[in-house]
Amino acid sequence: MNQKIFILFTLLVFFSACRSLHSVTNIGANDSFVLGNNRHGYFNVKLKNLSAHSIKVYQKTLTDSVHSFSVIKPKETVHVYADKNTALIIENKSEKQASVKLDVRGDVNLSMGYK
């Protein structure tokens, strides 16, 4: 019986871990980080600005339609919900490097890169 409980617990942890992504991402001066610029399902992000300056966050569809602009202040945390096939763009217009903490849930089959 204990072995069955252990196996069940291990499977639950494994499948839960596969649906989430945790990262601290550094974005260079005057650069952008793009999350999900590919075909994918819905996802949501808990994003914390770890920098000493504000960053801009917005979403862009695969057809280049842009929406949901937000300015995230230093140490501020926001929740962003992204539709299917929509990228999240984190833009650093500062002359200094920016850092963000990302907790992503949902479809995590997302492309990641710098623009």
Describe the role of every protein-language-model region:
Residues 52-68:
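Short, surface-exposed beta-strand/strand-loop-strand elements in extracellular ectodomains
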Residues 19-21:
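Bacterial signal peptide processing site
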Residues 47-51, 90-94, 102-104:
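Asparagine-centered strand-capping/turn motif at beta-strand->loop junctions
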Residues 94-115:
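C-terminal partner/receptor-binding element of secreted or periplasmic proteins
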Residues 24-32, 36-40, 74-75, 83-85:
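Tight coil/turn sites that cap or link beta-strands
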Residues 1-5:
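Positively charged n-region of N-terminal signal peptides that target proteins for export
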Residues 15-17:
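C-terminal motif of bacterial Sec signal peptides marking the signal peptidase cleavage site
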Residues 41-45:
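Structural beta-strand segments of beta-rich domains
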